């Protein structure tokens, strides 16, 4: 079995590389239909998804036409030999700069995978409207396989806690942010 997402894919903005070995080309600006503000109550797998495609049901929230920059990110020539992807076309939301959709092309420039990133935007203390959660579906067209993943698929349907949203009991930096503190927790 396995997953349709590789380490290079598993980043919520659609790109997990560095500018030292990658370059990119701007392709276009487009309005795209996306789910940017949603209710994670619908994110229960598989009931909250339109199967077998793994798309969110309407109960997740309202789809909106949002401004996107479309860019082609690829390795620089000296680093491209032997790399699995020749091109990564990212459809990035112009407000939050997250890749909401990524098309990945194999070394022969054939479409291999498409990955949807449903990046939820919410009120983040000190930042305002920013990314605060993600769900994803990766379709591997060459191997007829799909991986559906949701960060809200927990029994409490919680998004990550950020900054002052973190409950007081978890704001102990020594207990939760040091080896000695983690050793106390693991006892």
Put a short name on every predicted segment.
Residues 1-15, 62-164:
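Gly/Pro-enriched, hydrophobic low-complexity segments
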């Amino acid at each position: 079995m396995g997953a349709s997402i590789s380490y290079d894919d598993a980043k919520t903005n659609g790109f997990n590389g560095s500018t030292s070995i990658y370059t990119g080309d701007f392709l276009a600006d487009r309005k795209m239909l996306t789910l940017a503000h949603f209710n994670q109550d619908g994110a229960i797998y598989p009931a909250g998804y339109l199967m077998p495609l793994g798309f969110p049901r309407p109960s997740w929230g309202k789809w909106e036409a949002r401004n996107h920059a479309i860019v082609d990110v690829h390795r620089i020539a000296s680093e491209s030999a032997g790399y699995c992807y020749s091109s990564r076309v990212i459809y990035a939301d112009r407000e939050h700069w997250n890749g909401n959709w990524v098309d990945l092309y194999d070394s022969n420039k054939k479409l291999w995978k498409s990955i949807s990133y449903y990046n939820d935007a919410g009120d983040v203390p000190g930042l305002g409207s920013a990314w605060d959660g993600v769900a994803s579906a990766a379709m591997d067209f060459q191997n007829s396989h799909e991986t559906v993943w949701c960060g809200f698929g927990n029994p409490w349907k919680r998004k990550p806690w950020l900054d002052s949203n973190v409950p007081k009991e978890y704001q102990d930096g020594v207990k939760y942010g040091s080896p000695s503190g983690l050793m106390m927790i693991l006892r």
